[in-house]
């Protein structure tokens, strides 16, 4: 896959100052990578692969855990003194924003997150991670510590020839609105959920 680096800039945030790098696929799809600290290629890099979630990341939705995970991942990277966030433009697990709204409507009517996708004619998860290899290669990184609950992300990187030396769960944001969503991700999509995430809210 051809993924080209375009440009970079400083990105000051309330957590600290990151460097933001822009990448574009041949298809025109854009992705960004935020780095913090000095990237040393011979050292496993703490990273998060985060797929775009407008509702969670920008609109503070409590229907998912995405926004909570984004914030926590950046905090962990800053605390570690070094790391990167790959922000991938594949909204709604790859089905797009409008279809995500349709899926949410179906969930309002009783479907779970997997059933909603299937009723719309989609697989439960259409995301891909092939763009991550050239993005990481831009920094000569081939060993990572991955912040994720999703074993498919671990396997995807391994399939790309990237060594995942550690999977670090990022279990945050459980609330009354996303409790069943998190249950479904654990039970039907294989996500790691512990610390009472599967217990009843009390």
From Swiss-Prot:
Transmembrane segments: none annotated. Zn(2+) binds at residues 53, 64, 66. Pathway: Cofactor biosynthesis; riboflavin biosynthesis; 5-amino-6-(D-ribitylamino)uracil from GTP: step 1/4. Signal peptide: none annotated. Its cofactor is Zn(2+). It catalyses: GTP + 4 H2O = 2,5-diamino-6-hydroxy-4-(5-phosphoribosylamino)-pyrimidine + formate + 2 phosphate + 3 H(+). GTP binds at residues 48-52, 69, 91-93, 113, 148, 153. GO terms for cellular component: cytosol. Pfam families: GTP_cyclohydro2. GO terms for biological process: riboflavin biosynthetic process. Disulfide bonds: none annotated. Keywords: GTP-binding, Hydrolase, Metal-binding, Nucleotide-binding, Riboflavin biosynthesis, Zinc. Binds 1 zinc ion per subunit. The keyword Metal-binding applies. It is an enzyme of class 3 (hydrolase). GO terms for molecular function: GTP binding; GTP cyclohydrolase II activity; zinc ion binding. Its EC number is 3.5.4.25. Gene3D superfamilies: GTP cyclohydrolase II. The active site is at residues 125, 127. The keyword Hydrolase applies. Coiled coil: none annotated. Catalyzes the conversion of GTP to 2,5-diamino-6-ribosylamino-4(3H)-pyrimidinone 5'-phosphate (DARP), formate and pyrophosphate. PANTHER family: 3,4-DIHYDROXY-2-BUTANONE 4-PHOSPHATE SYNTHASE, GTP CYCLOHYDROLASE II-RELATED. Belongs to the GTP cyclohydrolase II family. This is GTP cyclohydrolase-2. It comes from Colwellia psychrerythraea (strain 34H / ATCC BAA-681).
């Amino acid at each position: 896959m051809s993924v080209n680096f375009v440009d970079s800039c400083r990105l000051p945030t309330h957590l600290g100052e990151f460097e933001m790098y822009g990448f574009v696929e041949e298809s025109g799809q854009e992705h960004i990578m935020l780095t913090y600290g000095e990237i040393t290629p011979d050292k496993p890099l703490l990273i998060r692969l985060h797929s775009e979630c407008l509702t969670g990341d920008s609109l503070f939705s409590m229907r998912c855990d995405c926004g909570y995970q984004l914030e926590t991942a950046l905090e962990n990277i800053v605390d570690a003194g070094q790391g990167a966030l790959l922000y991938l433009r594949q909204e709604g697990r790859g089905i797009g924003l409008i279809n995500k709204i349709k899926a949410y409507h179906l969930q309002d009517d009783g479907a779970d997150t997997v059933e909603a996708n299937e009723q719309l004619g989609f697989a439960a998860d259409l995301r891909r991670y092939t763009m991550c290899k050239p993005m990481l290669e831009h920094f000569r990184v081939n060993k990572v510590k991955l912040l994720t609950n999703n074993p498919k992300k671990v396997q995807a990187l391994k399939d790309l020839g990237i060594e995942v030396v550690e999977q670090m769960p990022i279990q945050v944001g459980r609330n009354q609105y996303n409790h069943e969503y998190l249950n479904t991700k654990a039970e039907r999509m294989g996500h790691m959920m512990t610390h009472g995430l599967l217990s009843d809210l009390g």
